[in-house]
């Protein structure tokens, strides 16, 4: 019987280090990342350390039991010698020790792992794998979390079966309390409400230019027709328009066109934590393909997302099994949000509400 190869003691020790994930993504990207974090946490039986960026990441992940240490940096593109944050990150990585690592960005930031002394064969890099065109991001993350870095073959526990192909968010108790106060201040306590999120950062940046040049712009008159239909179907529900401060003017233009009562423009009126608590409680959400739509679906809110040019299967809100519909249209044979009619949105929203009454396990 052949003897087993001698194992380097350093590699054996490194296999015991908590798993590390690096993903510096937008709001929705970080929501979807929770699928991988859940997969790895269950696989290793311990929380996962995370390197990320963006002011939304802390409130999104701070209550996740799958997350251990969260290290947020402002930028990966700043030259290393100019970034105190990057120096601190590298120092922390060296102190924690190298271990199984999953890199989930396009390329920026990989050099920071190298500076910290993490060997290439300790890393599963998402760019090194081929993905099926029918995969959602949740499917990809489940598969990525089942892979083992080359150096640790035979040393790590296998992936656990049965991890849902859906993002998961937990809301901090403080955010729930903040929501109660927020609702009370606006005399919305006990009310049901539908959330509409028509804007995106791409639209907001084009305030002085034609918005039709951005892939996520859907005309104000279309949104107004949808809002009117929502009011007819849900006469007793409040309608809340969410968004950032720069998206507030777009919201206001739609609200003026719709001319229906009991509509609130709450753009820039919500912290990330309070927004999550609001989404969890909402009757439903109608949105462009944007981060809050992923969060709403992950929180169990029936979510209809209007897609521009992004792949609707890959970026399906919240993953594979959430209560969501990714709606697309075509113009001259090409996928375009401008090919979606208000009637299609209303019909899809009504279908979604009927589907959402079935158990989540039955939703595909």
Regions found by a protein language model. Name each.
Residues 1-364:
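Catalytic machinery of carbohydrate-active enzymes
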């Amino acid at each position: 019987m052949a003897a087993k190869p001698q194992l380097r003691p350093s590699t054996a020790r490194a296999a015991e280090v908590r798993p590390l994930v690096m993903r510096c993504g937008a709001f929705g990207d970080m929501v979807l990342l929770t699928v991988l974090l859940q997969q790895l946490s269950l696989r290793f039986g311990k929380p996962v350390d995370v390197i990320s960026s963006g002011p939304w990441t802390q409130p999104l992940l701070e209550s996740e039991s799958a997350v251990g240490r969260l290290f947020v940096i402002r930028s990966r593109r700043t030259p290393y010698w100019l970034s105190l944050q990057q120096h601190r990150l590298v120092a922390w990585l060296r102190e924690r020790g190298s271990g199984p690592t999953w890199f989930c960005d396009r390329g920026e930031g990989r050099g920071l792992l190298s500076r910290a002394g993490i060997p290439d064969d300790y890393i599963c890099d998402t760019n090194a794998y081929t993905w099926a065109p029918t995969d959602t991001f949740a499917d990809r993350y489940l598969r990525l979390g089942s892979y083992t870095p080359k150096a640790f073959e035979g040393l790590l526990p296998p992936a656990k079966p049965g991890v849902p192909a859906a993002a998961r968010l937990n809301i901090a108790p403080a955010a729930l309390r903040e929501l109660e106060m927020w609702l009370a201040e606006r005399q919305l306590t006990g009310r049901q409400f539908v959330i509409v999120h028509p804007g995106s950062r791409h639209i907001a940046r084009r305030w002085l230019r034609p918005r039709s040049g951005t892939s996520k712009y859907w005309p104000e008159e279309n949104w107004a027709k949808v809002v009117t239909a929502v009011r007819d179907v849900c006469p007793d529900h409040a309608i809340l328009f969410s968004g950032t401060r720069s998206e507030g003017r777009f919201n206001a233009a739609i609200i003026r066109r719709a001319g229906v009562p009991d509509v609130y423009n709450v753009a820039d009126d919500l912290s990330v934590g309070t927004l999550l608590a609001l989404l969890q409680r909402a009757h439903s959400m109608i949105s462009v393909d944007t981060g809050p739509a992923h969060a709403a679906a992950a929180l169990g809110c029936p979510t209809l997302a209007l897609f521009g040019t992004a792949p609707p299967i890959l970026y399906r809100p919240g993953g594979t099994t959430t209560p969501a519909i990714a709606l697309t249209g075509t113009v001259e044979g090409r996928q375009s949000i401008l090919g979606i009619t208000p009637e299609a949105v209303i019909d899809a929203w009504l279908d979604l509400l009927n589907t959402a009454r079935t158990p989540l396990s039955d939703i595909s």
